[in-house]
Every structure is written in C-alpha cells, then in structure tokens.
Amino acid sequence: MANHKSALKRIRSNEKRRVLNRYQHKTTRNAIKALRLATDKSDAAAKLSTVISMIDKLAKKNIIHDNKASNLKSKLTKHVAKL
C-alpha cells in the first residue's frame, strides 16, 4: 500500500480514469459492432461518421494506439463501401 499522500491520491485518480476509459472504450466497441451489423448502406454511412469520431477521440486520449485507430477506420470504411 502507498505511504505518501500523493501516492494515495494517484491511486484514487487512476481508478477514476480507468473506469472512464473503460466506459468510453466499451461504448465505442458497441458502436463498431452496430455498424458492422448494419445492412442498409445509408444507415451504415450515417453511423460511420459517428464511429470514426469516437475512434479519433479514443486515439487522442491514448486509450487506443493511433495505428489501431487508423486500421479500424480503414476497415470500417471499406466495409461500408462494400455494402
């Protein structure tokens, strides 16, 4: 266990960030799943812009790596174009 006040505070703040990051990542994963299950091209195209925005926000906050974000966006764009 931590012995310093600053270390105890860091433990508390890390837990708060972990929960928030986990929520944002899970929400984005659910949106990606919904996009992949979409069968209508216009519906999927509408969802694509919001999903790409969510992915960019995760990458900006270093929740996911920049390259993973690029790969996801590329694959999802190809998927929507193929519909």
From Swiss-Prot:
Question: What are the GO MF terms of this UniProt record?
Answer: small ribosomal subunit rRNA binding; structural constituent of ribosome
Keywords attached to this Swiss-Prot or TrEMBL record, sorted alphabetically, are: Ribonucleoprotein, Ribosomal protein, RNA-binding, rRNA-binding
This chain's function reads: Binds directly to 16S ribosomal RNA.
- The gene that this protein is the product of is rpsT
A single Pfam family, by name? Ribosomal_S20p
Does this UniProt record's set of keywords contain Transcription regulation?
no
**Keyword rRNA-binding on entry:** yes
Q: Which family does it belong to?
A: Belongs to the bacterial ribosomal protein bS20 family.
Q: What is this protein called?
A: Small ribosomal subunit protein bS20
Which GO CC annotations does the UniProt entry carry? cytosol; small ribosomal subunit
Q: Which residues form a coiled coil?
A: none
Q: Which GO terms describe its biological process?
A: translation
Which organism is this protein's natural source?
A: Flavobacterium johnsoniae (strain ATCC 17061 / DSM 2064 / JCM 8514 / BCRC 14874 / CCUG 350202 / NBRC 14942 / NCIMB 11054 / UW101) (Cytophaga johnsonae)
